[in-house]
Amino acid sequence: MGKLRVTYVKSAIGYARDQKETLAALGLRRLNQSVLKPDNPSVRGMLFKVQHLVKVEEVEDEVQA
C-alpha cells in the first residue's frame, strides 16, 4: 500500500473539539506541517473527518533493495 502526505492548511480555531483531537492524533500541530501516514481505512476515516482543514496527496512507496 502507498502512503499519504497530509498537510495542515487551515486553522482549527472555531471547530469542534473532536476535530482538533483528530488533528493531534494525525500528528499535526502547526499550520503547513506535513506528515506521512499509511494509506489504510483508519487513517482515511480520520482524514474524512478533517478534510476541510488538510490537504492530502498520495505518495509512492520507495523501493528498498
Curated annotation (Swiss-Prot):
GO terms for biological process: translation. Part of the 50S ribosomal subunit. GO terms for molecular function: structural constituent of ribosome. NCBIfam families: rpmD_bact. Keywords: Ribonucleoprotein, Ribosomal protein. PANTHER family: LARGE RIBOSOMAL SUBUNIT PROTEIN UL30M, MITOCHONDRIAL RIBOSOMAL PROTEIN L30. It comes from Chloroflexus aurantiacus (strain ATCC 29366 / DSM 635 / J-10-fl). One of its GO terms (cellular component) is cytosolic large ribosomal subunit. The keyword Ubl conjugation does not apply. Pfam families: Ribosomal_L30. It comes from the Bacteria. Signal peptide: none annotated. Belongs to the universal ribosomal protein uL30 family. This is Large ribosomal subunit protein uL30. The keyword Ribosomal protein applies.
